[in-house]
Design a protein with these regions (language model features):
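ATP-binding N-terminal substructure of ATP-dependent carboxylate-amine bond-forming enzymes
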Residues: 1-95
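Active-site nucleotide/adenylate-binding loops and adjacent lid/helix of ATP-dependent enzymes
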Residues: 4-5, 100-181, 211, 235-251
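Solvent-exposed alpha-helices and their adjacent loops that cap or buttress functional pockets
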Residues: 21, 36-38, 60, 90, ...
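General beta-strand structural signal in soluble alpha/beta enzymes
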Residues: 30, 67-68, 89-92, 119-122, ...
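Internal nucleotide-binding/catalytic subdomain
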Residues: 156-293
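Active-site "cap" helix and flanking loop/linker of ATP-utilizing ligase/carboxylase catalytic domains
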Residues: 246-268, 285-355
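Peripheral (often C-terminal) accessory segments that flank ATP-dependent C-N-forming ligase machineries
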Residues: 310-420
Length: 420
């Protein structure tokens, strides 16, 4: 079959690469894709927001399935437009994508269906928000309601820091409309894990658990980012805890969405905190994680094209999804100034080819002449594969040592928590 991937980041590079080696897939298109994706997909210079134009292309080229990578097209209703045109799509409707598009929607739904998460309040008035902070005390978490590219969360260790975050968001300075309402929630102690699942509206099949590293600096210091590295499988989410998360979180949420008249199709991403009381929801995302995808998909043994088509058509079977008994690690190489700013146009030196034991996914690069240059905050995702996590990490950092660009920054402690 022919599959079209929407997006141009590291996550989409990983999806297109994995689809290109799936037996059921004969051709992959990428809209718009990136120069680095040329070896696994045909690039199509269409803006997804011109939906009529996109649908015409898909029909003219007899594309069988569309896979939506980023959150913005989902929240804008791309899946709905494709449904109306009769094109199968892996990705939730606009209504279902609110699970990520609105923190308030997600928290209220969890409360209604008793899905374990942190206690919270919702505010659009600065004074009321600050009263809640004063009453609750720190540490406390302040989140922008809308989409903020993974950066709309402040874990405040003091009341002053929380108040500053509220001022910043509710003033409209920081995230504009996305921050005009905030969710303030209790701080949950524990270790985080990401559990992604394939969903066809009713059936939920979990992927291998991974662990993301959100903060920019080693030791989980500095501001939050879209993610600085991941590894899988994550030992913190044992089989017992994963089963518990499925029974108390993912399956009830998918059932709740169906009951609310917005069945969920695609990848459901549960960001979990493993607390003393068991797994609780930190956040839901309505798509594959970035960079979780870069470690999860290389460990998949099933046919990704077949699995995604089954999700899109309501025919998902648990036995379609199998995992390799090995590990993967990803280290993100970011540009100078990230996450506040990003330096573009710096030449990337080093080997960017793919090996059996390591892959490089391009998050923010551009081809100029015969070399790649930086073109975003997160530039490359360097992935190492191995029989165990130590081997995978060694291979990852070995590759990192042979790549350089001006102002390159990366974390040297990805995966360290797995060895504690």
């Amino acid at each position: 079959m022919k599959v079209c991937v929407i997006g141009n980041g590291g996550r989409e590079h990983a999806i297109a690469w994995r689809l290109s080696i799936s037996p059921s897939v004969e051709k992959v298109y990428a809209v718009p894709g990136s120069a680095a994706m040329k070896n696994c997909a045909e690039l199509v210079g269409i803006d997804w927001s011109h939906m009529d134009h996109l649908i015409r292309f898909l029909k003219d080229n007899k594309v069988d399935l569309v896979v939506v990578g980023p959150e913005a097209p989902l929240v804008a209703g791309l899946a709905d437009a494709l449904h109306e045109a009769g094109i199968p799509v892996f990705g939730p409707s606009k209504a279902a994508a609110q699970l990520e598009g609105s923190k308030v929607f997600a928290k209220d739904l969890m409360k209604k269906y008793n899905i374990p998460t942190a206690a919270y309040g919702v505010f659009s008035n600065v004074d009321e928000a600050k009263q809640f902070i004063a009453k609750t005390g720190a540490p406390i978490v302040v989140k922008a309601d809308g989409l903020a590219a993974g950066k709309g969360v402040v874990v405040a260790m003091t009341v002053e820091e929380a108040n500053a975050a509220v001022d910043d968001m509710l003033s409209g300075n920081r995230f504009g409309e996305a921050g005009s309402t905030v969710v303030i929630e209790e701080f949950m102690a524990g270790e985080e894990a990401s559990l992604l699942a394939f969903v066809d509206g009713k059936t939920v099949v979990p992927m291998i658990a991974s662990q993301d590293h959100k903060r920019i600096f080693d030791g989980d210091k500095g501001p939050n980012t879209g993610g600085m590295g991941t590894y899988a499988p994550a030992p913190v989410l044992t089989d017992v805890l994963r089963d518990e998360a499925m029974k108390t979180i993912l399956e009830p949420m998918v059932a709740a969405m169906a009951k609310e008249g917005m069945p969920y199709v695609g990848c459901l991403y549960a960001g979990l905190m493993i607390t003393n009381e068991g797994p609780k929801v930190v956040e839901f995302n309505a798509r594959f994680g970035d960079p979780e995808t870069q470690v999860v998909l290389p460990l998949l043994e099933g046919d990704l094209g077949q699995i995604m088509m089954a999700c899109a058509t309501g025919t998902l079977q648990p036995n379609m999804v199998k995992w390799k008994d090995s590990s993967a690690a990803c280290v993100i190489l970011a540009s100078k100034g990230y996450p506040e700013t990003s330096s573009k146009g710096d030449v990337i030196l080093g080997e960017l080819v793919q090996y059996d034991t390591s892959i490089i996914f391009h998050s923010g690069t551009k081809l100029e002449g015969d070399h790649y240059v930086t073109n975003g905050g997160r530039v490359l995702g360097v992935v190492g594969l191995g029989k165990d996590l130590r081997t995978a990490l060694d291979r990852t950092y070995e590759r990192v040592d042979h790549i350089t660009f001006k102002g390159m920054q990366y974390r040297k402690d990805i995966g360290a928590k797995a060895f504690k």
